[in-house]
Amino acid sequence: MGRRLSVWLCTVAALLSGAQAKGTPLLARPAQPSASRYSLYTTGWRPRLRPGPHKSLCAYVVHRNVTCVLQEGAESYIKAEYRNCGWGPNCPSTVRYRTVFRPRYKIGYKTVTDLAWRCCPGLTGESCPEHLTDHGATPPHQEPEPQIPLGQLGPGPRPSPYSREAPRPRGRKGQGPFGERLEQRLSQAYGTLSGLVASHENPNRITGDSRAPVVPIGFGVIPEGLVAPEDRGRGPLIPPLSEILSKVTEVSNTLQTKVQLLDEVRGLALGHEAHLQRLREAPPSPLTSLALLEEYVDQRLQRLWGSLLDGFEQKLQGVQSECDLRVQEVRQQCEEGQAASQRLHQSLDGRELALRRELSQLGTQLQGLTLTGGGTCCSQLALISARVDSLERNLQAVTETQGGPGTLAADELARLSAAMLQGGVDGLLEGLETINGTENGARGCCLRMEVGGWGVGGFGSTLEQRVQSLEERLATLTGELSPESAIPDRSARPLVHSELAVLEQRLVSLETSCTPSTTTAILDNLVAEVKAWQSRSEALLHQVARHTALLQQLNGTVAEVQGQLAEGTGSSLQGEITLLKVNLNSVSKSLTGLSDSVSQYSDAFSAANTSLDERERRVEAEVHTIQEQISSQGSRLQAGHRQVLNLRGELEQLKAGMANVARGLSRCRDTAQELQHTVGHFDQRVAQVEGACERLGLLATHLNSLPTEQLRSREGLWGHIDKLNHTLAQHTQDIARLRDDLLDCRAQLAEVRPGRAD
């Protein structure tokens, strides 16, 4: 009997140390009713299974998976905030875009530890129903576990972890995958420890009623009424020692796992503390500095002003280059017009010279035609006499036909001829006198004679011109007087003789006017020559009549030639004049085009000036606008400065909150260290329990030799059991305190994370 009792005590100590395994039954057999008033096989407050047919059931610790919502990470999105301007009633509202982080969730799985009633190992048949042989089955007629009275839980009672839900921070649906994993592990560890200790919080669980199984304990206790009669005679079933050792090994492994979890918690706490330290030591944001904001605004204004000036200078340079190009084009056109006018003047000068040459050639031709009658003065005199005869005849005819008008015409002819001859001969004779006065000697006399001959020739040409003019006037007069006038006869010849007499007198006076140095021989020769000239003149007078007809023919030919020349000259002149008119028209048109282009350029310049004025006004308006914006920016900067000050106050508050969080984390770290010390102390207590088991084993060997009556009087064993219960109560209090610290840590972490997201 003593040996069996020692084995059961070791089993109870191992089970109280927190042994659990998936699907592993925790066996216990009831003791005899006469053993002691301190029965270890008592039921809970309300049994989960009614006593009766379920005597072969055992409590199993099972694990099941449940779905839950986990936070996978965070994603960012842009949120627009509209804020009213605070420095004025009419200022526009500002829009600020913020990047906000929101959590992203996923469906995860969580393992939950629970108790299930199943058939004990090795039991089958009528006492083990089929629906309880399945490992996933749960016993029927399960009822919820009632709340244990606070008076029976010892000094530090705590409710079951499954009936209390951890508080969650506001505004947050999850704590991230890392926090979820930590929470899951801590919850599992805390649930396991609480499940193991919950049944030992009240000593009445051990010494209470023995009619129902103890449900909250991590193992099943079958009451006395459920033991079969055949098993009661054979005594309680004793589990093998290897199973007990395996349970102890599992307990030690579980404790090592809890130590590792505590180490992880400590590492997480230290990591959070380091992160908070980095947040405290992080430099402030550059946007909170007013000097940096002012420098940024100044740089933006300088860049804007530089860009405006550069654009204005580029526009001015473009306008100036365009104006220069247009001025160069106008200058080029003016130079081309000047060159064209110069070419026109040169062509006109060339035409004028050509016309002058042609006129001089025409004069020489006319002079040649007048001299075709003879090469000497005699021939010229013959022609003159012939023309004079014809004139006399014409005048005679006029006098005969008209009578009175004839005398007038004769008087007119005499007057004209006398005046013409007088003027022309006087001039020529004066020229001859001057020439003769410059010569000396015989050579001089000869030269004077030659010059006199030249003078006579010139006199003949002059006389011919005078006669031609006289003929023209006579023809005009004859046409006016009578269109049917006849040719005059020789009645007008005395006039010619008188003129010749006058000429002879002038020659005589010329002879007498010679210098005294001349010799008489020369004078005699000259007199003889004059006489010869007189005789020749008489012969010429006779020849005049013969050459009258020839002279008339010659006059007709000359008239025809003159008409042809006049027509040719007129046509050429008309063509040249037409060409000149065309050139002048083209020049006038080009000048008109130049004036139009100049007017266009002037209009363009005026438009450019107006556009520049408008541009200047616009630039001034923009500058005023920029100044107003700068002033408004200054007011906004003041408002921003106030906001910065407010933000600084909020940051100070946040720093104070972070300091509080740091203090909380330090408390959490201290709690973790205390928990570690508690776990170490718990290991020591487990070692003490193992030693106690050994001592109890030795005690059991000694008790086997003692009778049963003496064993009843030994109260020391139950004293040890009371100590064990007291130790379990202390452990429950420590675990409750650790749970409170864990909840505080969770709340502080939940407060820190929203601040980081903001």
Swiss-Prot record:
Glycans are attached at residues 65, 436, 555, 609, 725. InterPro entries: Collagen/C1q_domain, EMI_domain. Disulfide bonds join 58-120, 85-91, 119-128. The keyword Heme does not apply. PANTHER family: EMILIN ELASTIN MICROFIBRIL INTERFACE-LOCATED PROTEIN ELASTIN MICROFIBRIL INTERFACER, EMILIN-3. One of its GO terms (cellular component) is cytoplasm. It holds the Pfam family EMI. It comes from the Eukaryota. Keywords: Coiled coil, Cytoplasm, Disulfide bond, Extracellular matrix, Glycoprotein, Secreted, Signal. The keyword Manganese does not apply. It comes from Mus musculus. Residues 54-130 form the EMI domain. Residues 131-178 are annotated as: Disordered. It is found in: Secreted, Extracellular space, Extracellular matrix; Cytoplasm. Residues 1-21 form the signal peptide. This is EMILIN-3. Residues 379-401, 460-483, 528-567, 642-677, 720-753 form a coiled coil. The gene is Emilin3. GO terms for molecular function: identical protein binding.
